[in-house]
Each structure stands twice: as C-alpha cells, then as structure tokens.
Amino acid sequence: MSRAIVLVLDSFGIGSAPDADKFGDEGADTFGHIAEYRYQHGQPLQLPNLTRLGLAEAHKEATGTYAKGFHEVETHGAYACAAELSSGKDTPSGHWELMGVPVHFEWGYFQDKENSFPNELLAQILKACELDGYLGNCHASGTEILKQLGEQHIRSSYPIFYTSADSVFQIAAHEEHFGLERLYQVCEKVRALIEPYNIGRVIARPFVGDKADNFERTANRKDYSVLPPKPTVLDKLQNKGGKVIAIGKISDIFAGQGVSESVKASGLNGLLTATLNAMEKAPENTLIFTNLVDFDTLYGHRRDIDGYARELETFDQWLPVIESAMTPDDVLVLTADHGCDPTWQGTDHTRELIPLLLSGQNVQAGNRGKRHSFADLGQTLCRLFDLPAMEEGKAIKLS
C-alpha cells in the first residue's frame, strides 16, 4: 500500500486562470512574475529541484511560455496545471477542491471597505463576548492594521476586527495584554454568531510587541472554519482504516473533519521538519498533508517579491531531503491552493492556475496537461488508496 505526501505551497499560482477576469486578476502569475523580477535584477531564480519535478513545464502548460530564466529540461515527475471550479479564490475552497469537493455555492462577504460588519452582528458579539468595544471594522492588511491600531488596542483592550476580499472575519489581539485563550474564546463565539452570514472562516490573529514599529504576529494563529459541504478524500481514507496526518493549518481548514492526527508547526523549516518526522513513523495507507503558509501570509499578501523568491529557493533545497525519506511506494505531490502574486495590485489572493507535480518511484514522468479542476488530485488520491471515487474530478495517470 502507498503513502501520499501532499505539500501545499500556499498561494503559489503559475498563471492567471481562464476566469481570472471575473476577479480582476487577468494577467496574474505568481511564479512567472517572481521569476521575471529576479531575472531583471540579475539574480535568476534558482529552483533546480522544482524544475526537475516539472515546475517550469507546468508553467509553460499554463501560460504558453517558460518563466524568465527557465528553459526545457528533462523532467523526473508527472506535471500538470489545474484550474479552479470553486466560486472563490480562498484557502478553504482551494484545499477542499484539492481533496475532491469544489465549492459551488457563493460564500458570504463583508464587502464595505469601512464599517464592514453589520451593526446588529457587532452588538451581538459585544454582548456574547462581554466586550466594551472594538477597533477596526474595516478591510485591512493584517500587518498594517497592527501599526495603525495596535497601541490603541493595548490601551483599551478592545480587539481589532477586520476583513478582506476573502470570506473572513479576522480578530487581532495582543497575546499578553488581551490574552491568547481569551482571543480564542472570542473567536469561537464569533464563529457561532456569523453562521447566518455564510462566512468561511473566523481567524484569530494574536500578536506581541509594545509599540507600532515592533508589533509582530505570532505562530498561534487559529482558523475557525465551517465543515466541508461533503465528505472529502480525508473522510474516505479514514473510513477505510487509513490515516490522515494534518500538519500546520490543515486541520483548521477542514475543521478537524477527516483528520486522524493534527501536528502544529510553524515556519517553513518547522513545517517541513514536522513532515519528515511524520514520514519516519507513518504506516502504509497514510496521507501526510502539509500547508506551507508563509508563502502566502509573509510574502504574497505583503507583496514581498524578494522574500517570496528566497522562500522558494529554501524550499527547493529541502526537496532532496524529503525525497530521501520516501519509501518506494510513496507519492509526493507539490501543489497550491490559489495564487497571491506579489507583483499584483492590492494585498489579496489572485485567481490562478496551480501546479500539480507528482513524483515517486512508481510515477511515470511526463506532461499530464491542463486539468479542469483541482479535484483531479482528489480523484487521483482515491485511485492511489483504492477508495470509492469522488463525484468530481478526473484521476491523473501515474504510470
């Protein structure tokens, strides 16, 4: 029996999706634009292992051209690009669709840039959480709003409420002055109160520091998601006696549904070390599922092109270590959940095609084309683990 190791490079899109114009994202290309930026600055992106596994070819399949500094090479894995069927370009939609369940309904959104949340909801939150007030109530970058309101938050003990183009209600609070457990309790109550609004996630955003220029978000972020609308590959594997090891924020994204073991870790090195530890002990018939969040939160949303490039190069250096821990029957999958082009306007996600790079001793190298849904990965995993087929998605041929 096989094991699958799925690493989600959160936000690593490889070219604008066919419907990107509906999202204002036509022309977005996270990988391509990072490569172009580094090439123009005389420091071409160095990703030999990702290239070996088919990244450059998947990008060419997605866009019709090689990224700057990349060219045709012999690949040692199966590669494809995939479009998203789900209605949104958010984290839960992307991950659920990867596991076979596209989101065909429309999420609720708080669309007003200022005074974003309904007064009735805010009043309910203050009462239920025994709060005297709040700050924010707007669309904002998570780091910028700390600079603007962090000191006032410490003085007042009012939590900071904010949102974005995603279906989210985010709450920032100081770990010491407000309290981490108190923040989690507030988020749990808000999660219950916003059910009528069909919001995908409430996110706890704890931070530390004592003034505007040194506030820093911590690794104690917690996402409060709704359950996927249907059973995912995770459920099917568990039901058949298999094991799902969720690393990083994966368990939060699926609201714990279908997760056998949740491993908390942070930072690229910490998350990949946790993945290696899981690979050492995981039995056959196990899915090891890791989200590498920093690509998105630290570099994509913050439009930090250099930081994103460095993180990609660091990840690339990890790949031989991951591969050396694989058994002969293991399948490694490198993919993403949406784009977040650091060269793009604004701070939000971008609607993009994603890479699907599959490798292992039993995987035949080559082009698997342009896929019509992220759910093709879920169907592929069903076939790998000999599970009942998902309703959507077409399995990728591995050999």
Curated annotation (Swiss-Prot):
Pathway: Carbohydrate degradation; 2-deoxy-D-ribose 1-phosphate degradation; D-glyceraldehyde 3-phosphate and acetaldehyde from 2-deoxy-alpha-D-ribose 1-phosphate: step 1/2. Its cofactor is Mn(2+). One of its GO terms (cellular component) is cytosol. Pfam families: Metalloenzyme. Mn(2+) 2 binds at residues 296, 301, 349. It catalyses: 2-deoxy-alpha-D-ribose 1-phosphate = 2-deoxy-D-ribose 5-phosphate; alpha-D-ribose 1-phosphate = D-ribose 5-phosphate. Binds 2 manganese ions. One of its GO terms (molecular function) is magnesium ion binding. PANTHER family: PHOSPHOPENTOMUTASE. This is Phosphopentomutase. It comes from Idiomarina loihiensis (strain ATCC BAA-735 / DSM 15497 / L2-TR).
